[in-house]
């Protein structure tokens, strides 16, 4: 059965994911190291993991596989889940796939190196999360859930 895993730290689409999971009657695991208000939805499990680097990511990576969908912005976690056969989405609806995950990891590493080489440079962060990002995410989540359900059957 398909499970929707949400890497919940700084996830702007948790509520949207819950609505979609409920509509599809999917189990949803919202994984964090704390600070989340548990959902009253019986399909949603709030998983609180111990503090520590990448503990939530490890929890998800150990469980996600073929027929599941993972929502995360964490590229190393996405790589592990893609390798395990799960379908993986960013919060803006962009899919991590076997075809693009290597490039995503390389770009992440390059950007980390550039930031480390220029400690005085302006970081700035990413662009704000928009209504278009939210709509793109919802469309992509619907598509990936249907595909994951097919994966789980075959």
Swiss-Prot record:
<protein>
    <recommendedName>
        <fullName>UPF0178 protein SPO3827</fullName>
    </recommendedName>
</protein>
<dbReference type="Pfam" id="PF02639">
    <property type="entry name" value="DUF188"/>
</dbReference>
<comment type="similarity">
    <text>Belongs to the UPF0178 family.</text>
</comment>
<dbReference type="InterPro" id="IPR003791">
    <property type="entry name" value="UPF0178"/>
</dbReference>
């Amino acid at each position: 059965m398909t499970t929707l895993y949400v890497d919940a730290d700084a996830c702007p689409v948790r509520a949207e994911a819950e609505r979609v999971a409920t509509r599809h009657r999917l189990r949803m695991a919202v994984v964090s190291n704390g600070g989340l208000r548990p959902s009253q939805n019986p399909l949603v499990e709030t998983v609180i993991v111990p503090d520590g680097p990448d503990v939530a990511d490890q929890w998800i990576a150990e469980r996600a596989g073929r027929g599941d969908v993972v929502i995360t912005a964490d590229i190393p976690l996405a790589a592990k889940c893609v390798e395990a056969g799960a379908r993986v989405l960013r919060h803006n609806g962009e899919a991590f796939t076997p075809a693009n995950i290597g490039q995503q990891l390389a770009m992440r590493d390059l950007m980390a190196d550039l930031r480390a080489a220029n400690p005085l440079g302006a970081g700035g962060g990413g662009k704000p999360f928009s209504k278009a990002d939210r709509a793109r995410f919802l469309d992509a989540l619907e598509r990936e859930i249907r595909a994951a359900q097919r994966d789980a059957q075959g």
